[in-house]
Structure formats: structure tokens, C-alpha cells
């Protein structure tokens, strides 16, 4: 696999040589991060491509474009080198701004169309809802933000995942995301390093939701109570009620409750595998933790791949219904606790 570099003006494009293959990594975090990091030395054979590597130049990996956002040039004696961080081109959405705002009952597609009406960079989007689970929710002054910020709001509001193919963006409900594989990860067997946090403090099996109230104080729909089938195993454990006036139908509230309820032990962890492993974004794998007798699916929500070496990837696995931001905060706290 070749890495290509082009200048900001896209006048020149060269194959990148002279980079340290052990330094080259691809980091992806669901809905949050996608970047390349690498180290490259300047030599007589790569002077042209080395000079192409600059702030805002492009790096191409497997057909995807990444933009150099951080570049550190250094010299030790006669050795000149650069440390490069390039983020996926979809992050350039943040350079456009939607000044206008919309309100009322809106679908995810309407919100996305409103966002990209302000796009000046050639982004396109597709919303795929094969099981028709998405419904309108009430928006109030949606807009007045950069496009990336507004997309993040839509992902959270409508419980979506975004998949980027350069500037072609696909949005799907979180329930439809990820391939269920037959791969198994067994604690202390398939890993050299494992750091799993298994938490039943947040385990709940029932939740009630309240939606919009009209000007006369009447509910648009009666409160919705969802009881998980897992209650037959764990008993009825009541989660704090959810109240959100953006919801005007019981069916849309029911979907939200099912996605909010943490009805199985929350599992989040980092692992380093013993062997090279081709992991896909959002893949589900079977997690086996024999000390607690646990056997259930967890999802790949982040990875760090070392593409040009045989070093296995580092994976973050989770079945936690928290957002990735919450997950990363949780992991950071766990790491700090371990250091003390």
C-alpha cells in the first residue's frame, strides 16, 4: 500500500518515501476522530515529497484524504525530520458555518439538509434508515454553528452514526450500525494486554419517558414505560426517568428509551491483541470473560492500527450506551486510578 502526498493547491502529488513504518498509525474513534500519525526523515531520495508535506497539504491512504493539521519540523545534526498528524477531510466541515436556524418538528434528513445548505466544499450526504426507526423530534433554533458541530448534534439527537468516504457522508441509525462477526476475544487468551471495566452499578431494566407538554399542560402522549426482557434475569431495576420535550410521539420516545437503558453489564476496555487482526469500524465481536461467566457481544468503538508493521491493533471495545466522549472520560479516570 502506497501513501501519497499532495500540496495544498493540488498541483503536485508524490508517493511518500522515507517515513518510519513503525511510527505510522491510523486512529479512529466512532463519530469523534480519524487521523494519521507518522515520522519522516528528509533524504536525498525524498526531498521533493518531504517539501510537499506542510500544513494543510493532503495525505492519501487507501483512497481517503487526510489534511495535515499538525507538523513539527526538527533537526538533529544533519538529520531533518517531520512529525505529522493529518485528520480526515470530513473534519474540514468545521470551516463552514450555518448562520440560519430552524425550529419545529424536524426529521434527521431535514436537519442534515439544513446543515449542508451552507456547505461550500462539496460535501454530500445520504441517510439510510432501512428499518424505518427514525422519527421527527422537535428542534428549537437548530443552526447557528459550524457544520461539524451541527452534525454532532444530529448524531446525538437522532442516535446516528456517520461513515465518511472522503466528502461523501452516510448516516445510519445506531441500531443498524456494525457487522456481527464470529470473532471471539477471550480474556487472557487472545490478548497480551487487557484493561476492561465491567460495571453493574448502571445496570437497569426499566425506564419511563416523558415527552412534550402543550400550552395547556397536557402531554402529547402518555408516559412511556419500557421494561427490558433482561428483567427476567436481573429483576426490575428502575433507571432514572427521561424527560425530553422534543419528543411528540410515543414510538419515538420508545426508541430513545431502548437506546438509553443500560440493561446489561456495561463493559468498556482497551486490548492489545497477540496477532494481526483486520477489524472493521463498528464490528461486533464475542467477549468471553470466564471469571464472571460473561459471554456477550461488544462493539469496536475505536482502534489504533499500525498499517506498515505486523504489530496488532489496539482496540477499544464497548457495549456501553454512553457516548464515546463519556467512554473516553471513563477510561481516562480508570487509567488515572491505576497510576496512583
Where are these regions (language model features)?
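Oligomerization/assembly interface segments of phage tail-like spikes and tubes
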Residues: 26-44, 79-91, 209, 259, ...
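Surface-exposed cap/loop segments at beta↔alpha junctions
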Residues: 45-126
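Extracytoplasmic/secreted envelope proteins and their assembly/folding machinery
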Residues: 109-113, 148-151, 206-207, 254, ...
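Acidic, small/polar-enriched beta strand-loop surface segments
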Residues: 2-4, 179-299, 304-310, 322-325, ...
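Solvent-exposed edge beta-strands and adjacent loop segments
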Residues: 1-31, 186-200
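Short beta-strand-centered interaction patches in the first periplasmic/extracellular domains
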Residues: 72-93, 127-204, 208, 213, ...
Amino acid at each position: 500500500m502506497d501513501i501519497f502526498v499532495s500540496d495544498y493547491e493540488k498541483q503536485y502529488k508524490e508517493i511518500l518515501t522515507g517515513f518510519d513504518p513503525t511510527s505510522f498509525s491510523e486512529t479512529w474513534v466512532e463519530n469523534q476522530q480519524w487521523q494519521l500519525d507518522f515520522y519522516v526523515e528528509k533524504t536525498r531520495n525524498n526531498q521533493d515529497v518531504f517539501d510537499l508535506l506542510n500544513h494543510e497539504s493532503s495525505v492519501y491512504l487507501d483512497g481517503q484524504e487526510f489534511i495535515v493539521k499538525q507538523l513539527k519540523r526538527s533537526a538533529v545534526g544533519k538529520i531533518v525530520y517531520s512529525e505529522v498528524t493529518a485528520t480526515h477531510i470530513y473534519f474540514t466541515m468545521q470551516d463552514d458555518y450555518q448562520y440560519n436556524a430552524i425550529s419545529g418538528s424536524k426529521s434527521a434528513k431535514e436537519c442534515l439538509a439544513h446543515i449542508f445548505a451552507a456547505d461550500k466544499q462539496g460535501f454530500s450526504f445520504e441517510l439510510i434508515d432501512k428499518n424505518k426507526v427514525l422519527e421527527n423530534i422537535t428542534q428549537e433554533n437548530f443552526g447557528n454553528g459550524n457544520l461539524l458541530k451541527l452534525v454532532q448534534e444530529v448524531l446525538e439527537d437522532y442516535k446516528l452514526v456517520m461513515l465518511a468516504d472522503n466528502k461523501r457522508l452516510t448516516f445510519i441509525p445506531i441500531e443498524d450500525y456494525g457487522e456481527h462477526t464470529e470473532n471471539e476475544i477471550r480474556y487472557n487468551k487472545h490478548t497480551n494486554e487487557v484493561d476492561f471495566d465491567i460495571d453493574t452499578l448502571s445496570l437497569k431494566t426499566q425506564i419511563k419517558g416523558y415527552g412534550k407538554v402543550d400550552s395547556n399542560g397536557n402531554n402529547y402522549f402518555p408516559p412511556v414505560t419500557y421494561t427490558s426482557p433482561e428483567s427476567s434475569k436481573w429483576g426490575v431495576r428502575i433507571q432514572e426517568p427521561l424527560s425530553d420535550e422534543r419528543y411528540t410521539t410515543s414510538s419515538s420516545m420508545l426508541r430513545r428509551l431502548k437506546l438509553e437503558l443500560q440493561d446489561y453489564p456495561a463493559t468498556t476496555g482497551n486490548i492489545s491483541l497477540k496477532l494481526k487482526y483486520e477489524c472493521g469500524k463498528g464490528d461486533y465481536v464475542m467477549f468471553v470473560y470466564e471469571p464472571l461467566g460473561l459471554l456477550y457481544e461488544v462493539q469496536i468503538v475505536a482502534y489504533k492500527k499500525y498499517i506498515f508493521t505486523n504489530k496488532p491493533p489496539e482496540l477499544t471495545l464497548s457495549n456501553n450506551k454512553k457516548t464515546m466522549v463519556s467512554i473516553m472520560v471513563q477510561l481516562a479516570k480508570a487509567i488515572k486510578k491505576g497510576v496512583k
